[in-house]
């Protein structure tokens, strides 16, 4: 019941995805061969959200793995949980997209897309009542961004009434993997604004910061970063997979967090994040979790929520706790930091409580916020885009695949519109008069 089909595209998407299935399998007591080795009926009660039960009681992930080159797939297949996936669900090309959005979206990716859609259709048909799709991908590369957005557009046509959610790794301000990131990201955002229901924005730099500052890791690897992403992904879907006192599903998250259809880019955070050495010195309480998950240092995207205001937010708690306490804390956060929440949406925090904590913790909370501060990220990418596009730098790689200049201009203006929409709602007040107070407050930050 209420199944989710998981799609991972490109290198980044597949690496996060592989880690995600480790985390989920761990929570549900499924071992790397797909056999159930858990100790509690609760693990099996709704295991079919993410798993198909095959013959002989084997649990197979509802996952579709796509890439335009075989490398990452082979690594996933050789990895610890590689034998878990259905071999037919690995769909890959041989050429690679070479960090080129146009290759992923128009040429190489377009050739592969039909076989991907067949596999996705196959997964969707084996569902009782498909709730939606979740995709992990990056926006800076070629396959995850180009082919990922192509697939999103195609699925949108075919399943218009199902939730489409993405976990998108955006280019970070200081750490850049690719010179043409701004192009790829802007072209992707152009698609994502129109075709997805909810996008969780992550970025490597913020994840590195969490690893350094909070987890006190001296040399964080991509494995550590991906693990952080996965705890969030697991938290967002926990109340679908385990019984809870206050449930939420993908649709509820969307309804409660998106006041205007285009503004569906969320920041995510997770608590408790403590370094390995200092865990035993901290009490895990609901106030502590709430305080930590609203903390700017815990946001997994390089935009500071203190520079904007929250339109809406949602806290998903896991573990045994009193719902009364959760409600009190939510109210507390809103009254204490009222200037960080727009006043024209009263009670704009949604809470949910799921009884089963993640492995190794007594309780945890996942934070999802729709903050106007996320415009910082779009603004930054947009500026880099404009700087390169002004000089038509690197453009021949894209036009060579049949793209038109117009598409770039459109994507650029769509991104700028998005930024100004966020800005407009950040400044709006309940009585809709230009509040001088608000403007001054914005300058002080």
UniProtKB/Swiss-Prot annotation:
Keywords: Cytoplasm, Cytoskeleton, GTP-binding, Magnesium, Metal-binding, Microtubule, Nucleotide-binding. One of its GO terms (molecular function) is metal ion binding. Its cofactor is Mg(2+). One of its GO terms (biological process) is microtubule-based process. Residues 429-445 have a biased composition (Acidic residues). Mg(2+) binds at residue 69. SMART domains: Tubulin (SM00864), Tubulin_C (SM00865). It comes from the Eukaryota. Residues 417-445 are annotated as: Disordered. InterPro entries: Beta-tubulin_BS (IPR013838), Beta_tubulin (IPR002453), Tub_FtsZ_C (IPR008280), Tubulin (IPR000217), Tubulin/FtsZ-like_C (IPR037103), Tubulin/FtsZ_2-layer-sand-dom (IPR018316), Tubulin/FtsZ_GTPase_sf (IPR036525), Tubulin_C (IPR023123). Belongs to the tubulin family. Dimer of alpha and beta chains. A typical microtubule is a hollow water-filled tube with an outer diameter of 25 nm and an inner diameter of 15 nM. Alpha-beta heterodimers associate head-to-tail to form protofilaments running lengthwise along the microtubule wall with the beta-tubulin subunit facing the microtubule plus end conferring a structural polarity. Microtubules usually have 13 protofilaments but different protofilament numbers can be found in some organisms and specialized cells. This is Tubulin beta-3 chain. The gene is TUBB3.
């Amino acid at each position: 019941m209420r199944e989710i089909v998981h799609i991972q595209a490109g290198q980044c998407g597949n690496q996060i995805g592989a880690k995600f299935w480790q985390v989920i399998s761990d929570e549900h007591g499924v071992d790397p061969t797909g056999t159930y080795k858990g100790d509690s009926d609760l693990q099996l009660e709704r295991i079919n959200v993410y798993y198909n039960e095959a013959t002989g009681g084997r649990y197979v992930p509802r996952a579709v793995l796509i890439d335009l080159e075989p490398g990452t797939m082979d690594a996933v297949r050789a990895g610890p949980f590689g034998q878990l996936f259905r071999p037919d669900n690995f769909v890959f090309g041989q050429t690679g997209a070479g960090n080129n959005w146009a290759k992923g979206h128009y040429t190489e990716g377009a050739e592969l897309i039909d076989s991907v859609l067949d596999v996705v259709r196959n997964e969707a048909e084996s569902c009782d009542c498909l709730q939606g799709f979740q995709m992990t991908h990056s926006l800076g590369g070629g396959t995850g961004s180009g082919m990922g957005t192509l697939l999103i557009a195609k699925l949108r046509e075919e399943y218009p009434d199902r939730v489409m959610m993405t976990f998108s790794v955006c280019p970070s301000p200081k750490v850049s993997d690719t010179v043409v990131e701004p192009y790829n990201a802007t072209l992707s955002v152009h698609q994502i604004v129109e075709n997805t229901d909810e996008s969780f924005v992550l970025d490597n730099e913020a994840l590195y910061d969490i690893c350094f500052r909070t987890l006190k890791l001296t040399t964080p690897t991509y494995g550590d970063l991906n693990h952080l992403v996965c705890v969030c992904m697991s938290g967002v879907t926990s109340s679908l997979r385990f019984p809870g006192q206050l449930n939420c599903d993908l649709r509820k998250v969307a309804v409660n967090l998106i006041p205007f259809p285009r503004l569906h880019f969320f920041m995510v955070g997770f608590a408790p994040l403590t370094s390995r050495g200092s865990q035993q010195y901290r009490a895990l309480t609901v106030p502590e979790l709430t305080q930590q998950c609203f903390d700017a240092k815990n946001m997994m995207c390089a935009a500071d929520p203190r520079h904007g205001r929250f339109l809406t937010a949602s806290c998903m708690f896991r573990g045994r706790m009193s719902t009364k306490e959760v409600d009190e804390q939510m109210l507390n956060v809103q009254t204490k930091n009222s200037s960080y929440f727009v006043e024209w949406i009263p009670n704009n925090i949604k809470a949910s409580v799921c009884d089963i904590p993640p492995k190794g913790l007594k309780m945890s909370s996942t934070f999802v916020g729709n903050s106007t501060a996320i415009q910082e990220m779009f603004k930054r990418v947009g500026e880099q885009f404009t700087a390169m596009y002004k000089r038509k730098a690197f453009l021949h790689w894209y036009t060579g695949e049949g793209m038109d200049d117009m598409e770039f201009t459109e994507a650029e203006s769509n991104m700028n519109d998005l930024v100004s929409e966020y800005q407009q709602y950040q400044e709006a007040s309940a009585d809709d008069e230009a509040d001088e107070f608000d403007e001054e407050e914005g300058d002080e930050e």
